[in-house]
């Protein structure tokens, strides 16, 4: 972060939004408007939501992704929109590990981690 100066100390922290309807991990216009509006609204730094680095590592099928060129292009749109709003841009990258196939909003079931709980296809 050397050489970067934020306009203030307010940061929008990353959150798990689960908002990719197409389940392809690609940024949508909703994401661009959502994050750009936070930048315009006064945050000095905007951190984009949890973004999976592989399809197998998603926390949900509706996560943003960063494993294809199409996704990278969408993330570029986000960065440009955040910068245009006057804020610095960051990203929370992640991988769900061995529990990547269990929906996080489900009640805990002893030993559950596979597609047996009506979850999405377990890839890992």
Regions found by a protein language model. Give the residues of each.
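Non-globular sequence segments
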Residues: 80-83, 94-124
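Glycine-rich, proline-tolerant flexible connector loops at the mouths of alpha/beta enzymes
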Residues: 47-72, 93-107
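Aromatic- and glycine-enriched glycan-recognition loops and surfaces
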Residues: 25-31, 66-83
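N-terminal amphipathic alpha-helix/helix-capping segment at the start of soluble metabolic enzymes
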Residues: 1-11, 82
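Conserved, mostly hydrophobic/aromatic
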Residues: 12, 38, 42, 82, ...
